[in-house]
Amino acid sequence: MAAGLPQIFHKRGTLAAAREPDIVNPMHESSSSQFYIVIGKKQDDKGLERGRKNLQKLFGDSLTMTKEMEETYRTIGGTPHLDGAYTVFGEVTEGMDVVEKIQNVKRDEYDRPVEDVRIIKATILKDMPGYEKKQVKRTVKKPVRRKR
């Protein structure tokens, strides 16, 4: 997957494709099987500036942070420093309390949950604008853990 579309950014609750580090993945290709859900935090001027600088580094003047993005990051939160570097493909529309519980599960030395956390059901709400291929919003439902 190609990284970064300006219409969709790393606000709280977005789903994005993970990827290997730049040193082993210089083309920044996204994983087809791993993703993350943005928790992030409400951003101040310093956090927004970090996001702006990253966009400038990646895209020059061809892609900038909009006023809508800034306001969303200030009021809802997110991770603006990831914009343009990872592919955002969906959004949690309900169940962020469950996502926060997942964030707090016990993890091993590789930052992986000690017990698997599985999303059993995701609901397609609508196609997301701006994508050539069909991309969808997803609703995260109650996670189920199983012993390894």
Model-derived regions: residue spans:
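Cross-family detector of peptidyl-prolyl cis-trans isomerase
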Residues: 1-148
